[in-house]
Amino acid sequence: MKTDIEIAQSIELKPIVDVVEKLGISYDDLELYGKYKAKLSFDKIRAVESNPVGKLILVTAINPTPAGEGKSTLTIGLADALNKIGKKTMIAIREPSLGPVMGIKGGAAGGGYAQVLPMEDINLHFTGDMHAITTANNALSALIDNHLHQGNELEIDQRRILWKRVVDLNDRALRHVTVGLGGPLNGIPREDGFDITVASEIMAILCLATDIEDLKRRLANIVIGYRYDRTPVSVGDLQVEGALALILKDAIKPNLVQTIYGTPAFVHGGPFANIAHGCNSVLATTTALHLADYTVTEAGFGADLGAEKFLDIKTPNLPTSPDAVVIVATLRALKMNGGVAKDALTEENVEAVRAGFANLKRHVENIRKFGIPAVVAINEFVSDTEAEIAVLKELCASIDVPVELASVWADGAEGGVALAETVVKTIAENPANYKRLYDNDLSVQEKIEKIVNEIYRGSKVNFEKKSQTQIAQIVQNGWDKLPICMAKTQYSFSDNPNALGAPENFEITIRELVPKLGAGFIVALTGDVMTMPGLPKRPAALNMDVESDGTVLGLF
């Protein structure tokens, strides 16, 4: 079998102008980045707003192994399969962060014969969105430090600045730094740090903004820190939202590419789901819904993180809610959740599949709490056995959830036809009745407890002293009606990454609450979740190279 990069390089791409023609998009509607990538103009986005709204399919997963369970691959393959059975379909997914690409994941544009192309460009610099977000974020940092240096008219307390610099890399050495050293000419010394770009509030804002004016409004609302009198300081107070929006004026426009089978795809925005809301841009998803009969999108990590945030944070900003949720399961992840060691996941173990099914069952139950029908997709691997697949299908039948085997990695669109047909049938026969998990009018504590009790199945939430102080500050400032964005390990329902399967009656500790007023939510930090990842002992970068003719090697 060829590698992902070898498959991608063997495909003859169509000009993006030809790919999107069937959607009613013309050459004049595009801002081209070469022959195969483009941004969609705001004029076209506004022109299609009066079109009917299509069906929305959300792809999520069970709690994953470190390698991931193939959500992006299944999302792409399902869309290709829907087109194959005659459904006018688009994809709306996130763009990869270079940090994980160079770190543990390698490429992140699907895999096998279910990829978005050109995958090398998408995984590297693409259309420059990550660069623009990084630049806007760091421009704000520079403007804050300049304000301190030039007399600090706003009386910002340099000990209470929340805003950090960012870089689109995994670099643990930058988590804590000191800036402003070198004497009076070089600024005011203070502690600072770097997050990864996709953890920046500006990334979340870009993915939730509906137009330039909304972008500016959200940027102005960012709280960068506090004054000496403990009152908040915003970007609006600094009067620099216009400059930041200027840097982002092109990045806010959705990017158009294609799959191996020519399915048009929006690849736009990429916040992490363990430290942010984990969904692609509202603008891309909404536009796809107006252009196609079916839109397939995904949310990061397991359904306890990405899907919950999609349904509680993103969906209220969309013209419709999901008509179906596809939960991706792999036998290796089920076995891991059933207690099998990572080095034994390729060995047949039917009993471990039975034990690990508790994890999948809980995710199905949780999706149903939102009033949306679920479909299970078994992402097929060569190590899967007939006995394991049979047991999983039997277990799914026992909870009355449709299940299909999908081999889109190996077989492309054809490998997803059965899944596509089942999803279409499920949508037709089981209309969704979407409802949010909680009302925003609940207190901060009540909203967090609702997520912990209903989705994670924990029994108690412990608020550390720092978070209690922050809750009082949030209430005092009138921010307590915002939704909650949980920052939690992706490997477990709990805040302990080693508590696999379906733990119950555990306690979760909230160590910090960070208001993200521009994004419009409050981040609740649990466990040891890092906003700047580190590299593994053997990073994927060690396998990457480029030949003298520019051919890329090693992106999986």
From Swiss-Prot:
Chain sites annotated for binding ATP: T65, P66, A67, G68, E69, G70, K71, S72
Record pathway: One-carbon metabolism; tetrahydrofolate interconversion
Biological process annotations from GO: tetrahydrofolate interconversion
Enzyme Commission code: 6.3.4.3
Keyword Ligase: yes
Keywords tagged on the record: ATP-binding, Ligase, Nucleotide-binding, One-carbon metabolism
UniProt xrefs under CDD domains: FTHFS (cd00477)
Protein name according to UniProt: Formate--tetrahydrofolate ligase
Ranges in coiled-coil conformation: none
Keyword Membrane on entry: no
HAMAP family: FTHFS
Family to which this protein belongs: Belongs to the formate--tetrahydrofolate ligase family.
Organism: Streptococcus pneumoniae (strain Hungary19A-6)
Catalytic activity: (6S)-5,6,7,8-tetrahydrofolate + formate + ATP = (6R)-10-formyltetrahydrofolate + ADP + phosphate
NCBIfam families in the cross-refs: PRK13505.1
Molecular function GO terms recorded: ATP binding; formate-tetrahydrofolate ligase activity
